[in-house]
């Protein structure tokens, strides 16, 4: 078995830099890590939600939670609140909380809920997190240690700021080498194993292990290894998204402690609350609705909370 001495990561953003940090923490500088990314490919930053498992990942790479919250415009996410997915009525809501109900693994809680006559929404009966989250309370207090909690949570983060923080952390803590450049091709040995990536301008980056974080471009897994894209269109028909940043009306407006997910005629709208703004987007099927109509749907949604003038801007 070959010894890994140099890992090359192709692609940056949250995926690339989180990979770099995770490998850096595992390697303890036993091997070198280089990340190459194109300076002309921006990180998409409309607001991003994570699962609670992100806490363990950030702990593993030694990143301060308080620094994350301060630097990434972050808020704490306690689940996802779904609006209008069944009947579309005003009271048609369902919360997927991140704290598991007590005894969920040993008892059928739905049966107890049914016996009680279905008087209250299921999420209100099985976990206290529903009340905490929907009244905009936090799952922990300000003096709770990093990553400890009373109720489980993930994060809402600004993806651009999150990638920048991970980059700084990977370079300073783990010595990751950062290269800006466009990958023009790859080289491989007789067995087909990658040996280097070639950059525009003639430079190359040699390595023993390569990680493809180039997203849909699939510069290694697609262009070199010819692994085809596997569509899930038959079960996930939505294929486009229009996105926007939405300001708060007032600096002290409440920040939603859950991702909001609102059903629409041809898809759904996400609404993620950061400290300084919201990130919203309409995921839809472009075969069923035009981009202009999808954009108008998103604008109408924004108008409900910030008014027509702000939404129009």
Q: Where is each model-derived feature located?
A:
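Helix-loop-beta segment of a Rossmann-like dinucleotide-binding subdomain
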Residues: 131-161, 196, 204-205, 274-285
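Flavin (primarily FAD) binding-site architecture
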Residues: 212-227
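Helical element adjacent to the flavin cofactor pocket in flavoenzyme catalytic cores
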Residues: 149, 153-184, 200-201, 207
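Dinucleotide-binding Rossmann-like beta1-alpha1 core, especially the glycine-rich loop
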Residues: 46-134
């Amino acid at each position: 078995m070959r010894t890994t001495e140099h890992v090359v990561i192709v692609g940056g953003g949250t995926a690339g830099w989180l990979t770099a940090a995770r490998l850096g923490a595992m390697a303890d500088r036993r091997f070198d890590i280089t990340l190459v990314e194109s300076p002309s490919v921006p990180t998409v930053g409309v607001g991003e939600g994570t699962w609670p498992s992100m806490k363990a990942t950030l702990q593993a790479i030694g990143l301060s939670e308080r620094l994350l919250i301060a630097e990434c415009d972050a808020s704490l996410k306690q689940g996802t609140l779904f609006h209008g997915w069944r009947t579309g009525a005003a009271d048609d809501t369902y919360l997927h909380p991140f704290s598991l109900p007590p005894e969920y693994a040993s008892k059928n809680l739905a049966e107890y809920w049914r016996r009680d006559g279905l008087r209250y929404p299921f999420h209100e009966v099985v976990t206290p997190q529903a009340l905490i989250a929907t009244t905009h309370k936090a799952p922990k207090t300000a003096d709770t240690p990093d990553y400890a909690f009373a109720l489980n949570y993930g994060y809402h983060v600004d993806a651009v700021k999150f990638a920048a923080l991970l980059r700084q952390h990977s370079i300073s803590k783990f010595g990751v080498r950062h290269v800006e450049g466009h990958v023009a091709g790859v080289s491989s040995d007789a067995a087909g194993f990658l040996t280097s990536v070639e950059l525009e301008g003639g430079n190359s980056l040699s390595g023993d292990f390569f990680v493809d974080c180039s997203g849909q471009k699939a510069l290694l897994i697609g262009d070199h290894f010819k692994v085809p894209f596997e569509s899930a269109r038959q079960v996930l028909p939505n294929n486009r998204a229009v996105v926007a940043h939405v300001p708060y009306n007032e600096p002290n407006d409440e920040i939603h402690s859950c991702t909001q997910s609102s059903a629409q005629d041809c898809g759904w709208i996400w609404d993620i609350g950061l400290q300084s703004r919201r990130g919203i987007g309409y995921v839809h099927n472009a075969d069923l609705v035009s981009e202009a109509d999808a954009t108008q749907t998103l604008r109408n949604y924004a108008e409900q909370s910030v008014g027509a003038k702000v939404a129009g801007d």
